[in-house]
C-alpha cells in the first residue's frame, strides 16, 4: 500500500504537466481525442468496428466501472431494469514525450500492470490507446495482445525517467498487434 501511495505521488506531477495543476488524473482531453478519432478517422472507425463489433443501442460511457476505474466503456442500458451491459472497455492516456514523431528509442508499447485489473476475470473486450502530446496521433493495442505479451514476457519493473520511479509494465513489441492512427 505504501509503494502504491509513493507511486501516485510521483505520477501526479507528470499528470499535471499533461492536464494542468490539480488535474493530474483528468484525462478529458484524451477522452475527447478518442471521440474525435471515432468521428473523423476512417481507419480507426473500421478497426473499432472489427474489434468491438456493432452492438445495437450502445453509448460510449465515461467511467463505466466507477470514478477510479477504466476511462470509457461501450455500454447498453436496459430500459426495463436500468441495468448496464458492458460490451467493451477503453483506457486512454497521453505520452508527453511523443510529439510529431514517436520517440525512436521506444521499441515497446507499455501497458501498466495496475490497469490489467480492469479486464482480468471478465470477458470484456479491452483497448488501450495512447495519444501524442497534440492528440493528432494514437497507437493502441487490444486485450488479446496484452494477455499474449504478459504470457510470453511477463511483467517488467522498469525505471520511468519522467516520474523518477519504477513502475510495472507489460511490454508489447511494436509489431502488427499495435495499431497506429492519425488525424489532421
What kind of region is each of these model predictions?
Residues 89, 113-132:
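Aromatic- and glycine-enriched beta-alpha-beta binding-site module
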Residues 95-122:
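Mg2+/Mn2+-dependent nuclease catalytic core
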Residues 72-100:
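Conserved catalytic cores of phosphodiester-cleaving nucleases, focusing on short active-site segments
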Residues 1-66:
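Acidic-basic catalytic patches of nuclease active cores, encompassing PD-(D/E)XK
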Residues 68-70:
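Short beta-strand or tight-loop elements
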Residues 38-56, 118-127, 147-156:
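Structural alpha-beta junctions
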Residues 64, 93-97, 133:
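An acidic- and aromatic-residue-enriched active-site/binding cleft used to recognize and process polar
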Residues 1-25, 78-85, 123, 131-184:
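Non-catalytic C-terminal interaction segments of nucleic acid-processing enzymes
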Amino acid at each position: 500500500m505504501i509503494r502504491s501511495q509513493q507511486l501516485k505521488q510521483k505520477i501526479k506531477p507528470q499528470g499535471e504537466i499533461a492536464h494542468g495543476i490539480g488535474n493530474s488524473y483528468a484525462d478529458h482531453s484524451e477522452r475527447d481525442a478518442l471521440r474525435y478519432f471515432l468521428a473523423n478517422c476512417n481507419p480507426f472507425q473500421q478497426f473499432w468496428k472489427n474489434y468491438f463489433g456493432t452492438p445495437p443501442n450502445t453509448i460510449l460511457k465515461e467511467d463505466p466501472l466507477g470514478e477510479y476505474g477504466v476511462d470509457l466503456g461501450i455500454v447498453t442500458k436496459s430500459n426495463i431494469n436500468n441495468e448496464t451491459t458492458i460490451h467493451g472497455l477503453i483506457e486512454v492516456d497521453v505520452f508527453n514525450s511523443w510529439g510529431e514523431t514517436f520517440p525512436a528509442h521506444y521499441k515497446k508499447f507499455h501497458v501498466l500492470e495496475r490497469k490489467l485489473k480492469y479486464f482480468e476475470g471478465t470477458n470484456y473486450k479491452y483497448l488501450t490507446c495512447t495519444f501524442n502530446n497534440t492528440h493528432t496521433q494514437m497507437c493502441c493495442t487490444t486485450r488479446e495482445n496484452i494477455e499474449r505479451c504478459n504470457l510470453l514476457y511477463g511483467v517488467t519493473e522498469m525505471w520511468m525517467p519522467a516520474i523518477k520511479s519504477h513502475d510495472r509494465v507489460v511490454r508489447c513489441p511494436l509489431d502488427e498487434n499495435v495499431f497506429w492512427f492519425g488525424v489532421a
